[in-house]
UniProtKB/Swiss-Prot annotation:
UniProt EC number: 4.2.1.90
UniProt entry keywords in alphabetical sequence: Lyase, Magnesium, Metal-binding
Any coiled-coil regions, as ranges: none
Chain positions recorded as substrate binding sites: H33, R59, E349
Protein name stated in the entry: L-rhamnonate dehydratase
Molecular function, one GO term: L-rhamnonate dehydratase activity
UniProt subunit comment: Homooctamer; tetramer of dimers.
GO biological process assignments: amino acid catabolic process; carbohydrate catabolic process
Site annotation Increases basicity of active site His: residues: D302
């Protein structure tokens, strides 16, 4: 009889943060909104707060970057560690160190589903259907997968059953789809800059932006719009039809997450051939089931916000059973290892984090070391062939650990 590998137990869990409201300057990292000045990601992008003129020009003006980056590290009895990052900052540190630690320490490194279910159940009364608590749980879950992969010496995608394709092809999200085309991406997704409070003039301005990019990019390059929860059904429908002559591939997250009936109506009234997508700010498997039932074409969970890799795998299976695509919100290595195993994820998102979109920069820079970026718009599976998620923690980022246990 062959010997079965004996796996160690988890000895410690620790939580740090960088950036956020108490930082002197933008720190980047897991909270990619936490950037310095003159960055496209903070330049008059339409949001639910745009109707208030004081908060229209900058998303940082209403506090989009106050949380900062949460870093969770789990250490096994043998000294090996796994870690992950997300958006939850100092408050996430409190949740990990003062509540979730009891479900982690003492468990076997392979007990990921058990820990996940206990974290969900224990926080249900104060987590709702997403947000800060779910971000924190997601970060712990990802750290556990990283540790498990490092202990057994396998990349996470092989723990999930292996790749179903040789490479991942990407579209780029940023202000310059024309530059994304030059870099080899298959498409470019732009933020909208106007909303219902701007009336028909706002629709004309965003449609003109799409028309301009269509002229620059040619007829076949994908163009998409990210509306970031800033619209209502009427406005979104009118904008979709205004952009239809320019072959807009999809219109994304037009409505707040809870407006399921609105998404159903938008899908029903959208131009033929134009896809309706959403899911970035949804958390929990149950919310994605409701979203799937609206009939949208692509669900876009963020693996760092929806419940982690454990939940993302469940969402992908749910979508597959309904013939829907899952294209996760850009999450770098944490989504790369998942999507290369999903048959219903034919492409993925890469978020441009350089200020003017002119260069490729790792999404979670500077907190991750050895974080890969696409080459000619693609990442080959061989790039992912390192234990765990294949990245290391940059401990020179002035990590702060505000709590302990």
């Amino acid at each position: 009889m062959e010997n079965i590998m004996t796996l160690p137990k988890i000895k410690h869990v620790r939580a740090w943060f960088i950036g956020g409201a108490t930082a002197e300057k933008g720190a980047g990292g897991g909270d990619y909104h936490d950037q310095g000045g003159n960055h496209w990601i903070d330049d008059h992008i339409a949001t639910p707060m745009s109707k208030y003129r004081d908060y229209e020009q900058s998303r940082q003006s209403f506090g989009i970057n106050v949380l900062g980056t949460l870093i969770v590290e789990v250490e096994a009895e043998n000294g090996q560690t796994g870690f992950a990052v997300s958006t939850a900052g100092e408050m996430g540190c409190f949740i990990v160190e003062k509540h979730l630690n009891r479900f982690i320490e003492g468990k076997c490194v392979s007990d990921i589903k058990l820990i996940h279910d206990q974290m969900l159940g224990a926080t249900m009364y104060y987590s709702g259907s997403g947000g800060l608590v779910m971000n924190t749980i997601s970060c712990v879950d990802l750290a556990l997968w990283d540790l498990f992969g490092k202990v057994v010496g396998l990349p996470v995608y092989k723990l999930l059953g292996g790749a179903v394709r040789d490479e991942i092809q990407f579209y780029a999200t940023g202000a310059r789809p024309d530059l994304a085309k030059e870099m080899g991406f298959i498409g470019g997704k732009m933020p909208t800059h106007w909303g219902p409070h701007d009336g028909d003039a706002g629709i004309r301005k965003d449609a003109a932006m799409v028309a301009d990019m269509r002229e620059k990019c040619g007829p076949d390059f994908w163009l998409m719009l990210d509306c970031w929860m800033s619209q209502d059904v009427n406005y979104a429908t009118k904008l979709a039809h205004a952009c239809a002559p320019f072959n807009l591939k999809w219109i994304e997250e037009c409505l707040p997450p809870q407006q399921y009936e609105g998404y159903r109506e938008l899908k029903r009234n959208a131009p033929a051939g134009m896809m309706v997508t959403s899911g970035e700010h949804h958390g929990t498997l149950q919310s994605f089931r409701t979203l799937a039932e609206t009939g949208i074409d692509i669900m876009q969970p963020d693996v760092g916000w929806c419940g982690g890799l454990t939940t993302l795998v469940e969402i992908a299976a749910l979508a597959k059973s309904r013939g829907q695509l899952v294209v996760p919100h850009g999450s770098s290595v944490y989504s790369h290892h998942a999507v290369i195993t999903f048959t219903n994820t034919p492409f993925s998102e890469f978020l441009m984090t350089s200020p003017d979109c002119s260069t490729l920069r790792p999404q979670f820079d500077p907190i991750l070391l050895d974080e890969p970026v696409p080459v000619n718009g693609r990442i080959h599976k061989s790039v992912l062939d390192k234990p765990g998620f294949g990245v290391e923690l940059n401990r020179d980022c002035h990590l702060k650990r505000p709590y302990s246990h």
